[in-house]
């Protein structure tokens, strides 16, 4: 596989963490963010100062700002508020999930309704800037990954998020397929069929992929895919959180579910405990002052063993194996046909997950694929393919769910079956169900059920102007066209009159093209102001940290001369006054003045034996540097068998 140099970045937009990669000097490189990490928490916070925080900065303040700190947005994107999975999250998320006017999922951000793609766009902006800072020039094109089992609306909503972030999304690629590209990148020998088991923070996918290698030319063909877009590490966390809440209630008689701050602290500790239990057999969840009642403060200190955690989540792991069985059946394969098993997603680091997958396939999963980075690497490879930088690679992906229309009797008639290789196009002739019917409604559906009502409604449109005729006489040609992103385009044509209507199925993001363009223009126009605001806030935060540490040092200082104390307090007052304004330069000057004048405090510190003047200066320097759908009109179609020419 020959690799040159390209500028189409690959982004793994994850539920829990996101990652960005690019092709550089013939190799794929995962890029570190501004905090020095190769992955970025998919967390976005909106502060009282109107600052938007992304990643670790957002995560750090989540305990004190739970209602405006958003995580696991990927579980909500492209969904309806009434969806069962959404209603489950409504009851457990610290932030407020609301319904838009048309019934889509939106979020309450500081008492304003915001669409999930708009929030996800902030993560994509961070990934974009991470890449730009690394290569030193503007990035406008990207390949973004989605769970293989994402439906059409979820895919389109992801593209909307990319557009809002200022990115031209060249391709939406399935996460397991991307992982297969990463796995097959350097493999030189032979053809093989692999299983990609992808258990991430919020979603689960299984894909069966055949890699053909003929004279160095590699074809990655997805044979089948299946999954659950609402099953992942967040659900594992929830099981542990519920256990801890119940144990605490038994001990103290207090239900922490009524305390958002306590629940946010518990979520962080539960995630940490879960991760620790992948390498140790017991850990403590120790949260002092978790809550209080009339008798005083209450503390949580509960031991959790690996065995206990496994008993809590084992059912979830077994739940992932059902789609695996279905995917093998759809591919007409047996377990023995699988050559390699690739684990992707952070939750696959759990020993019990690895054991259950190993037991199922009868072989140990590969250990040479980084589960946190493989998807972004594969996305970068696909970006290279699109740019012409990666040679001798052909990717054949599939549509995860069947697509069709509602016909007579409320039945879904399938036009494109699940696991059909994309891009693809299929047409079928339908007719009217009543005499002199002048219009039909094309109701587009996605799913595997026979009853239309049991499937996902993607949208509908009308074809009118049909010439009067007996029922069954007009010929209406319905065409489904799926592009390489897995996004559906539908047309209906009256073959007698030539009248035609088309629709591109759009996401349930509640965002029109005009709204998306407006958000993008606002983002671009305010970019410089946003940077200045961010720098000002960082400087004010540094000043706050310095004021806090200086006051603490004054309290600890022994025999501090009154004259010196007065001098330091004057500088403190000047800095406090300065941070009430908007002059960043003045704040910086006042910071430096306070650092200089307070450096003498070390000489009077109670901890002088452990702290010298150099340490104080280093500390201060460090602080400076860390700156609803309409009712369906009956679409009464009667299928006419295709006439052969």
Swiss-Prot record:
UniProt GO molecular function: ATP binding; ATP-dependent protein folding chaperone; unfolded protein binding
UniProt-listed Pfam families: HSP70
Domain of life: Bacteria
Cited Gene3D superfamilies: 1.20.1270.10, 3.30.420.40, Actin, Chain A, domain 4, Substrate Binding Domain Of DNAk, Chain A, domain 1
Induction cue: By stress conditions e.g. heat shock.
Keyword set, alphabetical order: ATP-binding, Chaperone, Nucleotide-binding, Phosphoprotein, Stress response
Keyword flag Lipoprotein: no
Residues found modified as Phosphothreonine: 203
SUPFAM superfamilies associated with the record: Actin-like ATPase domain, Heat shock protein 70kD (HSP70), peptide-binding domain
Family membership noted in the UniProt record: Belongs to the heat shock protein 70 family.
NCBIfam families for this protein: PRK00290.1 (NF001413), PRK05183.1 (NF003520), prok_dnaK (TIGR02350)
Free-text function comment from the UniProt entry: Acts as a chaperone.
Stated name of the protein: Chaperone protein DnaK
Gene: dnaK
């Amino acid at each position: 596989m020959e690799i040159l140099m390209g500028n189409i970045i690959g982004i793994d937009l994850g539920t829990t963490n996101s990652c960005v990669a690019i092709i550089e000097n013939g190799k794929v490189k995962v890029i570190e963010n501004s905090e020095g990490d190769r992955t970025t928490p998919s967390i976005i916070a909106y502060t009282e100062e109107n600052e938007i925080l992304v990643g670790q900065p957002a995560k750090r303040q989540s305990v004190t700002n739970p209602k405006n700190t958003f995580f696991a947005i990927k579980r909500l994107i492209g969904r309806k508020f009434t969806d069962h999975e959404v209603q489950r999250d409504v009851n457990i998320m610290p932030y407020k999930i609301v319904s838009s006017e048309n019934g889509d999922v939106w979020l309450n951000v500081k008492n304003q309704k915001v669409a999930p793609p708009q929030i996800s766009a902030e993560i994509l902006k961070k990934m974009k800037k991470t890449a730009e800072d690394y290569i030193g020039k503007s990035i406008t094109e990207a390949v973004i990954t989605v769970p293989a089992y994402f439906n059409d609306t979820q895919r389109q909503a992801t593209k909307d998020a990319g557009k809002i972030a200022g990115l031209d999304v060249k391709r939406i690629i399935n996460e397991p397929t991307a992982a297969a590209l990463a796995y097959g990148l350097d493999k030189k020998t032979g053809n093989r069929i692999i299983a990609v088991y992808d258990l991430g923070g919020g979603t689960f996918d299984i894909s069966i992929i055949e890699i053909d290698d003929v004279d160095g030319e590699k074809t990655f063909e997805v044979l089948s895919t299946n999954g659950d877009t609402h099953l992942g590490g967040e659900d594992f966390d929830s099981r542990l959180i519920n256990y801890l809440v119940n144990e605490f209630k038994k001990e103290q008689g207090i239900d922490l579910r009524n305390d958002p701050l306590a629940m946010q602290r518990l979520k962080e500790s539960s995630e940490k405990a879960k991760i620790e239990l992948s390498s140790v057999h017991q850990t403590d969840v120790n949260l002092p002052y978790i809550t209080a009642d009339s008798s005083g403060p209450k503390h949580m200190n509960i031991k959790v063993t690996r065995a206990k955690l496994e008993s809590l989540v084992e059912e979830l792991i077994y739940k992932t194996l059902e789609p695996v069985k279905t995917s093998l059946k759809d591919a007409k394969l047996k377990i023995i046909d699988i050559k390699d098993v690739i684990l992707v997603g952070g939750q696959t680091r759990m020993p019990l997950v690895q054991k259950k997958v190993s037991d199922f396939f009868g072989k140990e999963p590969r250990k040479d694929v980084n589960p946190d980075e493989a998807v972004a690497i594969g996305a970068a490879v696909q970006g290279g393919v699109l740019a012409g930088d990666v040679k001798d690679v052909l990717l054949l992906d599939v549509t995860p769910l069947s697509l069709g229309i509602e016909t007579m009797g409320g039945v879904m008639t399938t036009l494109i079956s699940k696991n059909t290789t994309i891009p693809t196009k299929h047409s079928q002739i339908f007719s009217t169900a009543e005499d002199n019917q002048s219009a039909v409604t094309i109701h587009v559906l996605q799913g595997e059920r026979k009853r239309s009502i049991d499937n996902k409604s993607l949208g509908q449109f009308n074809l009118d102007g049909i010439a009067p005729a007996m029922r069954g006489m007009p010929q209406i040609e319905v065409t489904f066209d799926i592009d390489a992103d897995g996004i559906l385009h539908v047309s209906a044509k009256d073959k007698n009159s030539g009248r035609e209507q088309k629709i591109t199925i759009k996401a349930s993001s509640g965002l029109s093209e005009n709204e998306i363009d407006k958000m993008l223009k606002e983002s671009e126009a305010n970019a410089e102001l946003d940077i200045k605001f961010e720098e000002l806030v960082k400087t004010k935060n540094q000043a706050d940290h310095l004021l806090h540490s200086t006051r603490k040092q004054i309290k600890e200082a022994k025999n501090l001369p009154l004259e010196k104390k007065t001098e330091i307090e004057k500088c403190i007052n000047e800095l406090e006054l300065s941070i009430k304004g908007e002059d960043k330069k003045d704040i910086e000057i006042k910071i430096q003045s306070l650092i200089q004048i307070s450096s003498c405090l070390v000489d009077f510190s109670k901890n002088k034996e452990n702290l010298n003047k150099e340490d104080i200066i280093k500390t201060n320097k460090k602080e400076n540097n860390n700156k609803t759908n309409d009712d369906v009109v009956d679409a009464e179609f009667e299928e006419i068998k295709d006439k052969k020419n």
